[in-house]
């Protein structure tokens, strides 16, 4: 009865007094076994079983027992739903509706049958049956069967009628009827009792609800909360809820070790323990009066908290270290705590010193009083040291916190361990310092102790503590003895103890610090260990040094100082997280690849998850032609070259891919791929490639289209791919949107290949190549004389030569680099042009144009080079050219119409002239043909403002004009026998005239006496290499010279193409580049003394210039007649510098770099008498005005 809840007890008290004398509680499980219900069992539900009371008459009792047996049997047959108990929130148990009505209705009809199935209680009385009926009718609204319908079978769904009150007196009835009458009476009484209990229930439930709210709130603090740590500990929120149910079912006041209450209590105790462990030693050692009120209050409060903690430890669950089980049973908790730390915690929690003082004050013995002063003080201090045993509790709490931090953050766990170790060392130093002073104090400061020797017995406690701590740390760190070495025996033993403790703590600190440092950068440590193994492997196999260096460079670029097991790390992650990490790692690759930018995001994710990272070094062959392809590669960073057997090369850079052709055709590699730089690639195996493309057929068609385009660019065909793409196009597989996407991918791929080639070609121009002057020694023995001339020495050792002379020929995809060049001295160039325009003698300028070498030109002619009509004068022929001579009539201007025809043989000239040009369909030799005269000899039209003097290059390729020459120009003829031309110009049998011809100015420059008009030339425009679109036509005007003749230059740059930036060279260090045909011809012509020389002309430098000026200008043609001393003249005033027969020109052995002016245009020098407008927009000068200092000119020896 004591275990029942109050509401149940009130219900039992409200029963009739003759009923309920003996009752006991039975579990629902036992009820089910006895009644044969077999239903669901709930341990929280209880049922009441009452002993039968003695019945008034045996017959009635027998009949009632039969009826009861029948009713119980019918109830058992109705299943578990009807016989199960009904439990409310306050713990009372009730039957389900209809169960008792069925018992009453079936009592009479099935008495005999129910008697056999009764539970053995044959002596149950009518009072017990009435109690059960009353229990079933306790709640209002429950069904009851009227007495008149007791024997009728129960109709489902029939409305229940309340039982009518029976009359007070009734005649005797049969047994069944007599059994029903007491039931009805009992029901009336129980209803009245139930009404009385319902009036009492609300007040009790309100009080119970108020107390239940506080209990629930406090109970929630004792249970584990749903937070980050509990979720990490138990795995899920459902597991946390199950743990909360465990705490509820364990009993009252069971505290979970991971509950919020225990967390804050442990934090409070931790701070209190630290304060105790610091303050108590200082108070015991340095303060003699310990009975002050603050000290007593502090100790009492501390002891009270520790005693409360001792009690709470008996109700706190214990975490088993072997597994994750948490003990919540109070009996197991008590036994486990008593066997472990109870004794230490109890001794450190009880105030032993105060108990001793209380006992001591009650003893009044005189002998005791006389000797108690010192003894009490000493013993009390020793007993107070028992509180220091709380250190064990501090260590346990810190260990728990370390576990918490270790489960959440690994780095925080390492830091917490280091902080704990440092704090523990400082605490031991603090204790050791107090002990160093406590021992002499307990000995009453003997004369040989360190306190007496240093005279600190009566000093302040701060000074005493400072020196004691210094002495203790000196011992513990093993660096000394403090102020002096120990003298007394007690000091010696204390010193040894300090050294042992200090050495142990120091070793622990070093070990923990090393472990922390290693754990902070484990990946770098792993890389260093791995590379040590690699070094030992290289030493064991005795690899050569260059191989070792390559291995070292590979490891540096591949792992970059950190090594991870990336496959295992990603394999342990979930698939969405793995895809997110891979997408982040490959974000640069996706951003730079047009294929991925235009593709389905699902395709990109599927592709990226199957990629494998690889690194290749410069010179590594990633793919070799003819091998079976098993991978394709995506370039994240780097440049590779696609090589074929035809030596046709293609560059691929960041964002491109290669190796997909054999994966698509299941064939062999069609080209080799070599890494030009360090390449960071992602590889895709053939199985993964086909697996991905099966899901995305549009991307397969994109790969096939790009592969066909690439094969076409390197000059190869693949019938399988071509057939597949053609079949897709004919079958209409491509819709408009897919076709647009594929075309965009192909266009981006072409652009990337073009950009990669340009970048690589520009980078290859940076190294210092072979000088131009030494190329003829290898290519043509006929040109060997050029190396011995002063011009060769001057050009080779000159530090300021333009970079265009030493640059290699541009590649097929390089394009017009002249457009992007920047002039080094633009203002100097603008100031030199008007000066040259007003000079009497022409000024020459070095050529800034890239020209092909003589060997390449010779190969083109041997291979059957057929020049267009406009270029026929460039190739001397024995049948088509008349004898060389000079034409005195000026050429006529030629109209230009642009064409798009390309000429492979003239591609180098086109690139030399600056990129994509447009030319005229009329022959270029119109102004160059012998005997061509201009009908407009008197009226020179103004030259085009945008004209560039790029044809100065062609001037040195022209054969000598016919023999008709003007009188004014014949004394200044410059000649070279055709037989002495370089092999690059020998296209056929050279013409050998009887007398050695003298090359004169070309016909387009020779109209001097007639005041010939300048002629604009438009070279061929379709001469650009593949990939270049023709640009607007460019015209090249020919300026009319004076009577003395207008002379071309040795090195002729286009005026609109500024010199590229060049790397300064040291004097005497020749830059190394391939040679140029132009330079070879000029140098040979300059080194052949074909004409008699009248006298030696010396090169005179008028004024020095800074080394920033580009190059010296050399006058190729002489100045005939008497000339005024205008700027640009080389000799004394009035002395012509013509090539007089019998005269030799002596060249200086050294040419100063300061005497070289910036390059000038081909037609930058005009005669003073020319009336035509200037060629440039620079301001004009008077012919006699000296705008620039006189420069030294190198006259030709021809």
Swiss-Prot record:
Segments on the Extracellular side according to the record's topology features: 288-293, 362-368, 442-464, 487-496
Keyword 4Fe-4S in record: no
Keyword terms, alphabetized: cAMP, cAMP-binding, Cell membrane, Glycoprotein, Ion channel, Ion transport, Ligand-gated ion channel, Membrane, Nucleotide-binding, Phosphoprotein, Potassium, Potassium channel, Potassium transport, Sodium, Sodium channel, Sodium transport, Transmembrane, Transmembrane helix, Transport, Voltage-gated channel
UniProt remark on domains: Contains six transmembrane segments (S1-S6) and an intervening P-loop. The segment S4 is the voltage-sensor and is characterized by a series of positively charged amino acids at every third position, while the S5-S6 segments together with the P-loop form a centrally located pore of the channel. Contains a cyclic nucleotide-binding domain (CNBD) in their C-terminal region. The CNBD is connected to the pore forming transmembrane segment via the C-linker.
Topology feature Cytoplasmic, residues: 1-266, 315-340, 390-420, 518-1198
Stretches for region Disordered: 25-183, 804-1198
Post-translational modifications: S-palmitoylated.
Protein name (record): Potassium/sodium hyperpolarization-activated cyclic nucleotide-gated channel 4
Enzymatic reactions: K(+)(in) = K(+)(out); Na(+)(in) = Na(+)(out)
Tissue-specificity statement: Highly expressed in pyramidal and granule layer of the hippocampus, in thalamus anterior nucleus, in the supraoptic nucleus in hypothalamus, in cerebellum, and in trapezoid nuclei and superior olivary complex in the auditory system. Detected in a subset of elongated cells in taste buds.
Composition-biased stretches (Acidic residues): 26-36
Low complexity: bias regions: 831-856, 866-880, 895-905, 913-937, 965-985, 1043-1054
GO molecular function annotations of the record: cAMP binding; identical protein binding; intracellularly cAMP-activated cation channel activity; potassium channel activity; voltage-gated potassium channel activity; voltage-gated potassium channel activity involved in SA node cell action potential depolarization; voltage-gated sodium channel activity
SMART domains: cNMP
